[in-house]
């Protein structure tokens, strides 16, 4: 079968150029990029009768358009200056796609296939696609899609037509992106409260959200728990279809037998975004949103590694040490070193909230603040004149000012509880200052506003 024969047998929606990366399967392939949902042609003179029968059976199979294949709207994630990830849930074995264009009409789009090589990451529940080759600080329009897979002959696989989502849009990070971001934390699978946050940040036009830990309520014992929390959260359909999510884990995100399967649902950063030394640090981030550099650090569990709750298989102290070396290197990058504003994200606070507060280094109870991380990271943040750390964990909004020996202030976001309220922490550069507004999304009010001058 020639390439020309294969292309002539393909429906129009599968014939265009397909652009994919080494991890995002990006190459311009004319016609042969995706298996045809229509006929496979082969000259009769080259075929034995049994082989002809197999091809006839393959060609005769007509896969109806699979209704209900897409389970919810796509979820944008792992934003980078030149790439954007998207994951979405499906109801049957399928291959995933995304098309992206620089115009709302979606003319001349680039098409990408589900991440993976040599096999695309087909799945019967979660599909993940990475759009690469993008420009920093640029608005794009995209749609996500899936093709159901059938097996008419043994392992021969035939896809249905692609079922597409609605067209959505996003902004890539970069120095010319809007100087605007948001942070939510400690949602703990309370989807009603989460819906108030997601509604608010969409109303405000926040172009990027950091989900700063403790997304589950308790143990995560199966992958479907992650699917519910991230891809199909009740009352929150479309919450990240136009607003990319940057995930920064909290202590609850490490609990349960499925905790290490998060990567099957939420994508990690490309290996090219970090050095070989830091290959295990696949969720740390350092990106620019306009004048603001955003840096993500993972404080891990709220108990020491030798605590019996960790079962002897955790290694959070070495993990924090590795992040310390990574953090130092981020300030050698010009786009981070030259940023007028730098905001770091941690789940567990880095400031001792009151004398004798549990520092996370003892067996009793659980950490209120993370002394080990504060000792490792705090001096680096101060040395580089970072203005702000955003945290969660305590479920109570709190503001601690900078001091003569500590350059950074700390804002703790609120979380669910009988005597607390959920917050959306919004950061935006206005009139030459970084203005942080803390929204009480339960009451619809602003409970705090804090202003920061550019770094000297």
List where the protein language model places each region:
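N-terminal active-site segment of His-dependent metallophosphoesterases
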Residues: 67-72, 78-85, 90-97, 105-123, ...
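Short S/T/G- and acidic-enriched coil/turn segments that sit immediately N-terminal to beta-strands
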Residues: 124-130
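Extended active-site neighborhood of metal-dependent phosphoesterases/phosphodiesterases
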Residues: 131, 139-169, 224-337, 364-368, ...
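Active-site neighborhood of phospho(di)ester-bond hydrolases with catalytic His/Asp-centered motifs
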Residues: 183-185, 209-214, 245-251, 344-346, ...
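N-terminal secretory signal peptides
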Residues: 1-23, 37, 50
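Binuclear metal-dependent phosphoesterase catalytic core
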Residues: 61-67, 73-83, 87, 97, ...
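Short acidic, glycine-rich surface-loop motifs adjacent to enzyme active sites
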Residues: 334-355
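N-terminal twin-arginine translocation
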Residues: 21-27, 36-62
